[in-house]
Amino acid sequence: MKDLDWSNLSFGYMPTDYNVRCCYRNGAWGEIEICSDEYIHMHMAATCLHYGQEAFEGLKAYRCPDGKVRVFRMDENAARLQSTCRGILMPEVPTALFEEMVKKVVRLNQEYIPTYESGATLYIRPLLIGTSPQVGVHPATEYMFLIFVTPVGPYFKGGFSTNPYVIIREYDRSAPLGTGKYKVGGNYAASLYANKMAHDLGYDCEFYLDAKEKKYIDECGAANFFGIKNNTYVTPKSTSILPSITNKSLMQLAEDMGLKVERRQVPEEELATFEEAGACGTAAVISPISKIDDLENKKSYVISKDGKPGPISTQLYNKLRGIQYGTEPDIHNWTTVIIE
């Protein structure tokens, strides 16, 4: 293993030794290439640069206490990328190719997989871009699919602790019938200013309401929202929300624990009724919410009265992390051992 301070990694980019690439030309995917270059040479008129023809994914590799390295639900990442491809007219990356490239890039960079004790992980970033030149709004004819990896610490510096959020109405993450359900860079560009506003106001993250009516809960920054009340796991249903693999997994685990699961429209005022709430996603796993302030209407929805994560959120977090690290039974066959 590399001699790194694994316990003090930030959630940021660190160079590793290799990335893997595969190009799409003449209607077919080519061979997988192993590359040590961190840079891409492409045409200045590439569609990814002008018309937003790019999609990405995020998943992690975990060094486990049994010495094995596992990844979590990479078939779901492949399926979500394929959905994005259909949405913005890019060729779908076959699941077998996606999984082979994930395995290859993790094995090539295994010296960068953090120790189990550090709580850090190897973040895996698949990226698909349109590379052929195009002037005029049309899909590319050539594409590059690449995957790089980088060791990361927790997304939120405080780890599993509560964080304050603020409702931002001046900006929308995505349009009601736009690209919100796809993992494309444009959605994140749309969130940059709102995220800066939230940080400038002293909050960890921005909180979005639906773009059409500003009545219903949408997303927590770059993560899905869930709330717990009356032994029920509640999460918003909307065409503009990215389908979170973490949220999908938490819903299943909540059912396994005997909770009722509701995926539906969640009015803003219902925030006052939740006993627990959190943001969930690959990067953060679960970020419990302490409060959500509505500055415009001078309201504060205090979720955690004692400032600590709630018992059900804690149980869900520990259960999911246990499956990812191989310390809990993987009854749903979510993990894949990449290195024995």
Residue ranges and their predicted role:
Residues 114-129:
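Extended, Lys/Arg-enriched charged tracts that mediate electrostatic binding to polyanionic substrates
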Residues 1-105, 127, 134-340:
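Helix-start/capping segments and mature chain N-termini
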